[in-house]
């Protein structure tokens, strides 16, 4: 199983986060990520943006050569860190043929175009119901400055959420 760590809402409040604090938070996220490296010894990746940091420790099962995470959408605006197996990924991939330019063969990449499909309506329950499998993920939409954290309905893959003093 893979593992991931994220920090969102870095700019919560009226003032943007100071660069020094962003780097401090990035270091903390990387330190937390090191603690779960045993869950994904094949690849470590990190995304650092204006309002989010995502780190991923990958265990390569599907697409070991190009499925490095965090995954980034074809337009560069959506970032995804996921742990799971999407059993119906081939069916979902076919659904988005010609509508989304997949960058990898990763089964989890289908979460990105699925999110884009449901983003306008905000019906993310319907989005999750389209996914068959065991999964947990954190997705950051940099264009709309929002995030979605979800897991499968049974909760096979662990997913923990918390906040620090400033509410991030």
Which role does the model predict for each range below?
Residues 1-168:
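N-terminus-centric sequence/structural signature that marks the extreme N-terminus
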């Amino acid at each position: 199983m893979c593992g991931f760590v994220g920090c969102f809402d870095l700019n919560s409040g009226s003032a943007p986060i100071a660069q020094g604090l962003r780097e401090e938070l990035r270091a903390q996220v990387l330190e937390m990520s090191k603690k779960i490296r045993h869950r994904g010894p094949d690849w470590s990746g990190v995304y650092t943006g204006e309002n989010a940091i995502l780190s991923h420790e990958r265990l390569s099962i599907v697409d070991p050569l190009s499925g490095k995470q965090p995954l980034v959408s074809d337009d560069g605006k959506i970032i995804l860190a996921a742990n799971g197996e999407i059993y119906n990924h081939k069916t979902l991939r076919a659904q988005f043929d010609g509508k989304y330019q997949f960058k990898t063969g990763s089964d989890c990449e289908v979460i990105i175009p699925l999110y884009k499909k449901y983003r306008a309506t905000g019906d993310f329950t319907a989005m999750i119901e389209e996914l068959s499998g065991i999964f947990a993920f954190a997705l950051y939409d940099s264009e709309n400055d929002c995030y979605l954290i979800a897991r499968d309905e049974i909760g096979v893959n662990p997913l923990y959420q918390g906040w620090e003093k400033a509410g991030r």
